From Swiss-Prot:
InterPro entries: DH_E1 (IPR001017), PDH_E1_Alpha_Subunit (IPR050642), Pyrv_DH_E1_asu_subgrp-y (IPR017597), THDP-binding (IPR029061)
Post-translational modification: Phosphorylation at Ser-205, Ser-266 and Ser-273 by PDK family kinases inactivates the enzyme; for this phosphorylation at a single site is sufficient. Phosphorylation at Ser-266 interferes with access to active site, and thereby inactivates the enzyme. Dephosphorylation at all three sites, i.e. at Ser-205, Ser-266 and Ser-273, is required for reactivation.
Gene: PDHA
Modified residues (Phosphotyrosine): 274
The organism of origin for this protein: Sminthopsis macroura (Stripe-faced dunnart)
Protein's GO biological process: glucose metabolic process; pyruvate decarboxylation to acetyl-CoA; tricarboxylic acid cycle
Binding, thiamine diphosphate: 91-92, 138, 140, 169-171, 198, 265
GO CC annotation terms, alphabetical: mitochondrial matrix; pyruvate dehydrogenase complex
Protein residues bound to pyruvate: 65, 91-92, 130, 138, 140, 169-171, 198, 200
The enzyme's E.C. designation: 1.2.4.1
Localization per record: Mitochondrion matrix
Protein name according to UniProt: Pyruvate dehydrogenase E1 component subunit alpha, mitochondrial
Main subcellular location of this protein, as a coarse class: mitochondrion
């Protein structure tokens, strides 16, 4: 069967703040890109559903915040930047850890606290890191000043790199975010502030938490755009637009991605006490990011349903194998508790004794 090489799609116009014009309202998707995006988004979705299952079996313990429903955000952002650019986010970090290049098995093994995990089983759900990905961060909003620091480093070192600094609609009300806006604007830092607005901060809807829910205007003197966070192409085009702005030396930009999480805030939240099952169902049936991409591809002869089903089978197998690894891999031994605290073995002595000898550095 002859497939089309690419297709052009109309995408939702972004609302803008302090800008003459926003990102384009059309996007070209090649067949190759479409298949890649589909596979990555489907992998994130299945990985999160597997994490849900392992949590309910008490194999994953502690904090666990799932990303299903928001796959268009991590995929679209990654598609709009370079691998050498930087990303930092809050604790809903599994999707970004994957799009930044880590294999599923290392992510699931981190969730189960095993040696093969990306942080050697010591970080868990909220503390995963990859190349140029500065992780999940457990404190609400605390990653935003860090992201501005990364952008400062990019500028200071005269690198043509930018930092995507993510936070949620709940964290948007944190004072430190406004302090970070000010510094980024003052020093014209290459930072894109990205508010993933999934409508609820824990159990509080945006209307109950914010006097103004136009998060993209919150930067006041920083230009902002409001983006459909359920459409991977919309997110990609907006990211390219914001990245070009930041790279040109004009300073920061704010992006609000309007998205939705299918799970509760964390695994301890069933997610239905402050919103109705019907609301979740409606989003799933009308604006699911994976369904939207799939329909576009099938209806525009970029892929066949059979081909996408084959990808689904591949993804499921990859997730099953990863889960197998994450449950069979050994836990780190107790004596490694103090390892990896210092990047190099500390040489200094206190009162003639080296207290740190037991905290070896690299494994």
């Amino acid at each position: 069967r002859n497939f089309a090489n690419d297709a052009t799609f109309d995408i939702k116009k972004c609302d803008v703040h302090r800008l003459e014009e926003g990102p384009p309202t059309t996007a070209v998707l090649t067949r190759e890109e479409g298949l890649k995006y589909y596979k990555i988004m489907q992998t994130v979705r299945r990985m999160e559903l597997k994490a849900d299952q392992l949590y309910k079996q008490k194999i994953i313990r502690g904090f666990c915040h799932l990303y299903d429903g928001q796959e268009a955000c991590c995929m679209g952002l990654e598609a709009g930047i370079n691998p050498t650019d930087h990303v930092i986010t809050a604790y809903r970090a599994h999707g970004f850890t994957y799009t930044r290049g880590l294999p599923v098995r290392e992510i699931l093994a981190e969730l189960t606290g095993r040696r093969g995990g990306c942080a050697k089983g010591k970080g868990g759900s909220m503390h995963m890191y990859a190349k140029n990905f500065y992780g999940g961060n457990g404190i609400v909003g605390a990653q935003v000043p860090l992201g501005v620091g990364i952008a400062l480093a990019c500028k200071y070192n005269e690198k043509d790199e930018i930092c995507l600094t993510l936070y949620g609609d709940g964290a948007a009300n944190q004072g430190q975010i406004f302090e970070a806006y000010n510094m980024a604007a003052l020093w014209k830092l290459p930072c894109i502030f990205i508010c993933e607005n999934n409508r609820y901060g824990m159990g509080t809807s945006v209307e109950r938490a914010a006097a103004s829910t136009d998060y993209y205007k919150r930067g006041d003197f920083i230009p902002g755009i409001m983006v459909d966070g359920m459409d991977v192409l919309c997110v990609r085009e907006a990211t390219k637009f914001a990245a070009a702005y930041c790279r040109s030396g004009k300073g920061p930009m704010l992006m609000e991605l309007q998205t939705y999480r299918y799970h509760g805030h964390s695994m301890s939240d069933p997610g239905v006490s402050y919103r109705t099952r019907e609301e979740i169902q409606e989003v799933r049936s009308k604006s699911d990011p994976i369904m939207l991409l799939k329909d576009r591809m099938v209806n525009n002869n970029l892929a066949s349903i059979e081909e996408l089903k084959e990808i689904d089978v591949e993804v499921r197998k990859e997730i099953e194998d990863a889960a197998q690894f994450a449950t069979a891999d050994p836990e780190p031994p107790l004596e490694e508790l103090g390892y990896h605290i210092y990047s190099r073995d500390p040489p200094f002595e206190v009162r003639g004794a080296n207290q740190w000898i037991k905290y070896k550095s690299v494994s």
